[in-house]
């Protein structure tokens, strides 16, 4: 065809490929039907398919060398006609035509051309549709007879073809038939002999011209020759042996092997065989074409001149035959498939010398096969489905009956029947075993479901009961449950693992503060309780179940929410047990009994305190060391009142305090406080409180200063504003009112009175600078002068009786403040603040007047007194002030140091928590990453050691 066109310099298109099967062995299978209706239809509709919809027009496109390079042209229109006329006997032939079309495009054109990109897009769509094709190829219908009209048309057309001048066709056929010889002579198989010299020289020249043209434009010559050798029409036509059409043949005529083939065809394809088909597709892929092409088709002995091939190789094998057997499902398992592939390679190694090029190709392809075959999963026998066994049993028993009827006298048929019977028995046994396994596997699931339902019902009942019980009883139940859980055997614990998953789903996740508090609480636990903590974590966290309980690292971020909640319950229960430590008898007591016992204890303590106070009152003048013990008793009283946990208990204790001996308690409550001696060095706390509360002006005696202290405290607790009283109006035993301020504050906290109500006024710090004066006999004139000045603002209804004054002091200690609401407390606090401001103003006025008077007194006294009369009031007050300020500074330093230490501990805890969080995040980030530098270092070390 192309030789005369080159000689005359005229480009002539060859006739299109044939689409009518002259051998009449075409079939219509489900896979071919899918290729026609789905694959071809979608490819035809694609926007890039227009260059492939008809044969290449070399005349129109001015491609004189196209048909010299492309020996087997193909297009979508030819494939469509072949599918319509049932040209193909199986789907693999049609798929081969599609691949030929794409390969022709890649072979002739450059890699970056537009037509190549269009072909790649079409091929991608083709492979996607091909993956959805049915796995098993089955004949759809019986072969239809060709109508007479069509036969006549075919005969007329064939007659026309014969009568027409067919010079070009003859030349094309002559070139087509011997084209195998030069191709194989150029290929690595240098074993061709006995070919005709003329035809080989002509075709060799033709191929070399095409190769030169191809080398100038697209790719090297070797790839062109190899690709053209694959798709030569004579090579494929001679090598492909179509399977016989078994539909038209009766079953009784077929031999035993073909009957066996029919039995296997109905069996489902296993997972291993699917992997084998994928391996076969991989070996036939284009990326392995350079070393796999000699094994695509059977060895053509006549074309290659290998007359002794079948003498050496007894069982020839190739990839085309293996693919055909795989399509026909002749392989029962993956090992038979592997045996055929290895047989193909062994034949190559056996016939060719070791240094031959084909042997190296075979080794490369075998490496590909072995690597993929080693990755096939191993299928257990029990994994076969029941439907597979049932179909096999029915088919084999049916064939057994037919075989018995058809082969009564033949010994070969008898052996076949025995084999089928054994197979049926084995499959029945396998079915029975499989059913037993299913029954056994379903039994524990039912038991677990029943246990789950029972446990759910029990949980609901427990919740209803627990809602009505006391919290102490709930704690007892928790303890009993924990003991029972410890005593349970391991098997019982394993059964409850399924129930924990429900708790895990319902558990509320913890925030950062809760986790931090939980870690602090765990650190507070004693050593004997930590074992239970480790047990809870290991039982609920499978990742930590195998860890060493003696040395375990716990990251709260990795623990489940249910585990954290369980730990929180256990730790809180343990911490509740530790401070209480109640005896066994008191556990079962009710609230009323507990309240009654506490009341009795408080009453006893109050009686003891009252008795001691009475004794202290008698002995105050004689013995001055006793009041310190009374202070201790008062502190015991305050501790007993503050130890009551609930509000009802505090009410009962306060009511007892107020109700017992109204006259005695009011008259004896405050005489119990100690007398302040001028020469005694006050303690740090007393100095601090007196600094904040006692506000004496200059020149006043110790008696008036004590009156200031008492009136400040009473005005802070009550709504009445009491001004300072003169010294001659004070009761005779009011010098005992210089009490310990700390104990008063403690009593007020016991009575739940807000601590803001007992704060000193704002002007106290300024008034402290005046100091505390000491009583001396020369101060009579001072007191008389102060009386006249202080009487004007103090003219209010103040009774002088002792009982009334003590009642006014005892009022703020009453428990009425406990029952007040928050609004009343706020109003009371506001009133107290207003009264403090008014009082501060009045005191400021009094202080100014006193300062003026003291200045005048100092001026007169300096003139009258001598320099050696001793220390003045001012110098003594300055000394006391210096002492107080020094002690206050020490206290301030100690408190600041304690605060700094607590802040440092908090900062350390925060830093530790922050570092742990950063470390955890870093570990999480490093889990999914690969350290390439580390990998490279390992590789270099390995190479150095290897060398």
Swiss-Prot record:
GO biological process terms held by the UniProt record: chromatin remodeling; male meiosis I; male meiotic nuclear division; mRNA processing; positive regulation of gene expression; regulation of DNA-templated transcription; regulation of RNA splicing; regulation of transcription by RNA polymerase II
Biased composition range(s): Low complexity: 637-662
Alphabetical list of InterPro entries matching this protein: BRD4_CDT (IPR031354), Bromo_Brdt_I (IPR043508), Bromo_Brdt_II (IPR043509), Bromo_chromatin_reader (IPR050935), Bromodomain (IPR001487), Bromodomain-like_sf (IPR036427), Bromodomain_CS (IPR018359), NET_dom (IPR027353)
A single GO cellular-component term on record: nucleus
Intracellular or extracellular location(s): Nucleus
Chain segments annotated as coiled-coil in the UniProt record: 417-470, 591-621
GO molecular function terms attached to this record: chromatin binding; histone binding; histone H4 reader activity; lysine-acetylated histone binding; protein serine/threonine kinase activity; transcription coactivator activity
Keywords in alphabetical order: Activator, Bromodomain, Chromatin regulator, Coiled coil, Differentiation, Disease variant, Meiosis, mRNA processing, mRNA splicing, Nucleus, Phosphoprotein, Repeat, Spermatogenesis, Transcription, Transcription regulation, Ubl conjugation
Record's keyword annotation contains Repeat: yes
Residues the UniProt record annotates as site (Histone H4K5ac binding): 109, 114
Compositionally biased region (Basic residues): 447-462, 482-494
Main location: nucleus
Organs and tissues of expression: Testis-specific. A 3-fold higher expression is seen in adult testis than in embryo testis. Expression seems to be correlated with histone H4 hyperacetylation during the haploid phase of spermatogenesis (spermiogenesis). No expression, or very low expression is seen in patients' testes with abnormal spermatogenesis. Expressed in cancers such as non-small cell lung cancer and squamous cell carcinomas of the head and neck as well as of esophagus, but not in melanoma or in cancers of the colon, breast, kidney and bladder.
PTM text: Ubiquitinated in a SPOP-dependent manner, leading to proteasomal degradation.
PROSITE patterns in UniProt: BROMODOMAIN_1, BROMODOMAIN_2, NET
Family, similarity comment: Belongs to the BET family.
Classification via PANTHER family: BROMODOMAIN TESTIS-SPECIFIC PROTEIN, FALZ-RELATED BROMODOMAIN-CONTAINING PROTEINS
Function: Testis-specific chromatin protein that specifically binds histone H4 acetylated at 'Lys-5' and 'Lys-8' (H4K5ac and H4K8ac, respectively) and plays a key role in spermatogenesis. Required in late pachytene spermatocytes: plays a role in meiotic and post-meiotic cells by binding to acetylated histones at the promoter of specific meiotic and post-meiotic genes, facilitating their activation at the appropriate time. In the post-meiotic phase of spermatogenesis, binds to hyperacetylated histones and participates in their general removal from DNA.
Pathological association: Spermatogenic failure 21: An infertility disorder caused by spermatogenesis defects and characterized by acephalic spermatozoa in the semen of affected individuals. SPGF21 inheritance is autosomal recessive.
Protein name: Bromodomain testis-specific protein
Lineage: Eukaryota, Metazoa, Chordata, Craniata, Vertebrata
